[in-house]
């Protein structure tokens, strides 16, 4: 009985295979000669009107198979078009799962490697930047220290040795010929105190600068003063500031001097009568607020008197030598 049952099962299975083959081949159209390259390795595929039976063997062994169909048209290269009559390809699901797992593992490993590489590169860049910053800071600190050391050394050298100070640059001296010197001597004898316009004219004539002319006249006056050669006329105001005691005494008694007295003072001070008169007028102007000038009928001269002090009683009139004026 068991043998009969086994035979019957084998017969039914063969009939099922043949029936499926006939139905499938009748409905199929022209197919490609080789499976497409973008699919994984199929366990079975259709070529022409032939069906390889490893597909049925897998069915008989109750292995879960994943199959898909791809409708291809000769005028269309799209493998996912469902409206086209086409070829049926069968794949093993275990292989697909393995391939997917392997691809996922490789993707994860690549992603992990990329992350680790980026992390290492970031660390290296950070370290290099940090080192470069430290080096630049160290260099700047060293430069500042060197500059401070150099400045301290220079200061010490200046304190310890005065020869470090650079010497002063001497001015270029004017080379004057003998003719120029003789002409300058003649100008000095005529006027030892030339004004600004005369100095410019002299400088233009002798092809010299105004400063050189000023220094030459100044040195000439100093040399004559040291040698006590005072033939030239000195400045009268300087001499008045030194010896004006006699003028003050006469002014206290007679603020308006007579002509004889003016000539006497001009000859004694080696100046002109006009400068003596100017001195008296300025002195009267300076005392205009504190003193009053009155006319003395007995003397016939103007005098000034103060409310607190009477100069006429304390300073008698000084007698002047008329012969000195005539001489």
From Swiss-Prot:
GO cellular component: nucleus
GO molecular function, a single term: DNA-binding transcription factor activity, RNA polymerase II-specific
A biological process term (GO) from this entry: regulation of transcription by RNA polymerase II
Entries under Gene3D superfamilies matching the protein: Homeodomain-like
Main location group: nucleus
Swiss-Prot/TrEMBL keywords: Coiled coil, Developmental protein, DNA-binding, Homeobox, Nucleus, Repeat, Transcription, Transcription regulation
Tagged with keyword Coiled coil: yes
Region (Disordered): 129-181
Highest taxon in the source lineage: Eukaryota
Extent of Low complexity compositional bias: 129-152
DNA-binding region per Swiss-Prot/TrEMBL record: 169-228, 232-291
Sequence ranges of Basic residues compositional bias: 168-178
SMART domains membership: HOX
Subcellular compartments: Nucleus
Function field: Putative transcription factor.
PANTHER family: HOMEOBOX DOMAIN-CONTAINING PROTEIN (PTHR15467:SF9), ZINC-FINGERS AND HOMEOBOXES RELATED (PTHR15467)
Protein name stated in the entry: Homeobox protein 8
Organism: Dictyostelium discoideum
Lineage: Eukaryota, Amoebozoa, Evosea, Eumycetozoa, Dictyostelia
Name of the encoding gene: hbx8
């Amino acid at each position: 009985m068991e043998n009969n049952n086994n035979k019957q099962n084998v017969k039914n299975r063969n009939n099922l295979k043949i029936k499926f083959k006939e139905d499938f081949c009748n409905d199929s159209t022209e197919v490609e000669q080789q499976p497409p390259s973008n699919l994984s390795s199929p366990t079975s595929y259709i070529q022409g009107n032939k069906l390889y039976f490893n597909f049925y063997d897998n069915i008989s062994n109750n292995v879960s198979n994943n199959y898909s169909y791809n409708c291809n048209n000769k005028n269309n290269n799209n493998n996912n078009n469902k409206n086209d009559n086409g070829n049926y390809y069968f794949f093993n699901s275990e292989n697909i799962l393995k391939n997917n797992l392997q691809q996922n593992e490789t993707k994860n490993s690549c992603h992990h490697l990329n992350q680790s590489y980026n992390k290492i590169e970031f660390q290296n860049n950070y370290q290099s930047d940090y080192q470069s910053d430290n080096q630049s800071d160290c260099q700047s600190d060293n430069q500042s220290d060197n500059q401070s050391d150099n400045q301290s050394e220079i200061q010490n050298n200046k304190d310890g040795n005065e020869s470090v100070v650079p010497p002063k640059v001497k001015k270029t001296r004017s080379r004057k010929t003998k003719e120029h010197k003789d002409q300058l001597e003649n100008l000095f004898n005529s006027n030892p105190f030339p004004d600004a316009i005369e100095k410019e004219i002299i400088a233009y004539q002798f092809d010299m600068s105004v400063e050189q002319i000023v220094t030459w006249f100044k040195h000439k006056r100093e040399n004559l003063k040291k040698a006590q050669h005072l033939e030239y006329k000195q400045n009268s105001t300087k001499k008045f500031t030194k010896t004006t005691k006699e003028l003050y005494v006469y002014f206290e008694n007679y603020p308006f001097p007579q002509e004889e007295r003016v000539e006497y003072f001009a000859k004694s001070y080696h100046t002109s009568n006009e400068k003596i008169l100017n001195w008296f007028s300025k002195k009267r102007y300076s005392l205009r607020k504190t003193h009053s000038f009155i006319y003395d009928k007995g003397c016939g001269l103007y005098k000034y008197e103060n409310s607190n002090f009477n100069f006429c009683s304390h300073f008698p009139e000084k007698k002047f030598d008329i012969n000195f004026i005539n001489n």
